[in-house]
Amino acid sequence: MGLIKKFKDYFLEEDYEEYEEYEEEYEEEEEMRQATKANTKSNVVSLQSVQKSSKVVLIEPRAYAEAQEIADHLKNRRAVVVNLQRIQHEQAKRIVDFLSGTVYAIGGDIQQVGTKIFLCTPDNVDVTGSISIDSDDDTSMKRW
């Protein structure tokens, strides 16, 4: 009888250990599934928070030195309307050149929306449509 008991104990313990290992693996898989579900839920971003943070800044610079302030707004993902009507043409041209480089670097866009008025937008702002500018005014004939 001793030999039969040893066989039973040997085989029953092995089955029991295998069962425990299987049980642990199952629990680990279940925990991984729950962790994956939690990760996918945290990747959701509310569209309302994105829409509320969008801003448009209006700036009428008096000197070329203010171009950096405009570029900072663009870097912070804000659209900027720049009115260059009260600045000398040469300085206005330099500002437009500087802002053109800025919007290129951030993947944005710059558009003329009026005589000496420009709309600079970062990559998170889409502008659709176009505005035709009258070429009757002598100042609009000058090339930027």
UniProtKB/Swiss-Prot annotation:
Cell compartment(s), UniProt: Cytoplasm
GO cellular component, one term: cytoplasm
Keywords: Cell cycle, Cell division, Cytoplasm, Septation
Biological-process GO terms, alphabetical: division septum assembly; FtsZ-dependent cytokinesis
Domain of life assignment: Bacteria
InterPro entries per UniProt: Cell_div_SepF, Cell_div_SepF/SepF-rel, SepF-like_sf
Quaternary assembly: Homodimer. Interacts with FtsZ.
Assigned protein family: Belongs to the SepF family.
PANTHER family in the cross-refs: CELL DIVISION PROTEIN SEPF
Functional note: Cell division protein that is part of the divisome complex and is recruited early to the Z-ring. Probably stimulates Z-ring formation, perhaps through the cross-linking of FtsZ protofilaments. Its function overlaps with FtsA.
Protein name: Cell division protein SepF
Gene that encodes it: sepF
